[in-house]
Swiss-Prot record:
Record lineage: Bacteria, Pseudomonadati, Pseudomonadota, Betaproteobacteria, Burkholderiales
Claim: Hydrolase is one of the keywords in the record: yes
GO biological process, one term: allantoin catabolic process
InterPro entries noted in UniProt: Allantoicase, Allantoicase_dom, Galactose-bd-like_sf
Keyword Hydrolase: yes
Superkingdom of the organism of origin: Bacteria
EC numbers: 3.5.3.4
Name of the protein in its database record: Probable allantoicase
Name of the gene: alc
Source species of the chain: Ralstonia nicotianae (strain ATCC BAA-1114 / GMI1000) (Ralstonia solanacearum)
Amino acid sequence: MAMPTLDPNAPDFTRRYPNLADPRLGAVATFATDEFFAPKDRMLNPEPAVFIPGKYDDHGKWMDGWETRRRRNGGYDHCIVKLARPGVVKGVDIDTSHFTGNFPPAASIDAAYLPHGEPTDATQWTEIVPSTTLQGNSHHYLDVFGTHAYTHLRVNIYPDGGIARLRVYGQPQVDWKGADRATLFDLAAMENGAYVVEVNNQHFGLASSLLMPGRGINMGDGWETRRRREPGNDWCIIALAHPGRIRKIEVDTAHFKGNFADRVSLQAARVTGGTDATLKTQAMFWQTLLPEQKLQMDHQHYYEAELADLGPVTHVRFNMFPDGGVSRLRLWGALE
């Protein structure tokens, strides 16, 4: 797995919200009017788009994205994407990386809420991204305003061409009110709405990988920092999906062998004021939820008796000593 590029110019919504069009969370491209040159599912690939000079297939130049044939009969192409979770869309990235003479001149996005089925000709769509001029080989970060949750998107390209990647950033909708208070939920799961607020280093792997479902597929699918050459330790701050009392923790070092974190600990707090930006300082003084624990390579570590009862918390600071990698972090808790 390639290390996703962290775009310093990307808007805040790309860091604050999960990508609801991520196939690792369950998103799928269900239909396209045409995919002659490149299949629709490639557009949702979580890895950055690549260009391979000289690579051709039976349909022509191989492109890393969704690409339709040249239209000669009017009209335009579209692709339907089922989101991983129903969610309120906050922003999108229409990425035309490596598409230069074959990108669509414009695109728009419609949305629908269909919790029990797939779109039909009778589906009522709502425009969430109006027709927008596109450039070749570029990211197009577009804010989306609204409070309605959606399950499906229709990506329209005018009239044809290719999109390398589609990212749909939004707040997952979870029915917490109807949830059983006696059941333990993974409050650090991205699919439930948890997100990374701040991280001191993610040179080799993104901290957000800690929150992904399933076990890591390889060493690149986890949080890994550079080699520390000075005193201190590495850390990240995570906002939980819902306030809760943490009862069980899993720290998984899958695939990390010569570079796993030597030890880890967790601090936690119930944050009632301030902003995400102020947590970096506050977190240094949070109470200890899990004292330092020695880790093993390529292993799932579980903790229950070791946890302090801090009551309901909203945020945790995950500390690695002194550096290294961890694949996944699970924080099972009872809802407040």
